[in-house]
Design a protein with these regions (language model features):
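Cys-dependent protein tyrosine phosphatase-like superfamily
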Residues: 1-120, 133-205
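Short cysteine clusters
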Residues: 124
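Substrate/cofactor-recognition hotspot
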Residues: 127
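Conserved SAM/SAH-binding loop-helix junction
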Residues: 130
Length: 205
């Protein structure tokens, strides 16, 4: 007889909290929240806990965009519960720290940044790389800030280290900057017609 497949046991509330505070480094994020106001509509941070989400709501923030994806992990489960309890709208886009995403994901990111209730908070795990890219695109594409200025959102001040593997995002931004300077093409049109994450990743460390 073929044995029935066994289901992985669901994590207990205690296990979820342990994974959240220890494995996901939530305890460290309490000390270094990496929380900044970008403009009247957007704030950035590392992965927020219930207390910081409550503070954000009390400041008028209405929605939260997680760049970690909607996965059944401890930090996502904790965040879902907190946002539901606080009345914050929570949405997800999955970006990666050390590799470039497909163009459809970048367009989805911009769509969420456009349509989510404002003011909004955007975050990843550390608030450095994925969040820095999201803020860069928000400022350049949605607010018309020149790219060279918008890229300041990717800075060591926010714990972004461009010489690390996370610096691969600059290959994409450099390629777009060259095309934009030459032809005047906008970022979204460039993503639809010319962006190739595979080619841009070749030779990356």
């Amino acid at each position: 007889m073929t044995p029935h497949p066994t289901r992985a046991p669901q994590a207990t509330p205690a296990q979820i909290l342990r994974d959240y505070w220890i494995k996901d480094h939530a305890a460290l994020r309490l000390l270094v929240p990496n929380f900044y106001k970008v403009d009247a509509d957007l704030y950035r941070a590392n992965h927020p806990g219930h207390r910081r989400l409550r503070i954000a709501r009390d400041r008028g923030i209405r929605s939260v965009l997680s760049l970690r994806g909607d996965e059944p992990t401890a930090p996502t489960l904790v965040e879902k519960r907190a946002c539901a309890a606080l009345g914050l709208e929570l949405r997800f886009v999955r970006l990666w720290t050390t590799r470039l995403v497909e163009g459809e994901v970048l367009l989805e990111l911009l769509d969420q940044l456009r349509t989510m209730p404002k003011p909004m908070l955007v975050h990843c795990k550390s608030g450095a790389d994925r969040t820095g890219l999201a803020v860069t695109l928000y400022l350049h594409v949605l607010k018309g800030v020149p790219l060279v200025q918008a890229r300041r959102a990717l800075h060591w001040q926010y714990a972004h280290l461009p010489w690390s593997r996370a610096g691969i995002v600059h290959r994409m931004l450099d390629a777009y900057a060259e095309a934009h300077e030459t032809t005047g093409i906008g970022f979204e049109d460039w993503v639809r017609t010319a962006y190739d994450p595979v080619t841009l990743t070749e030779g990356a460390p």
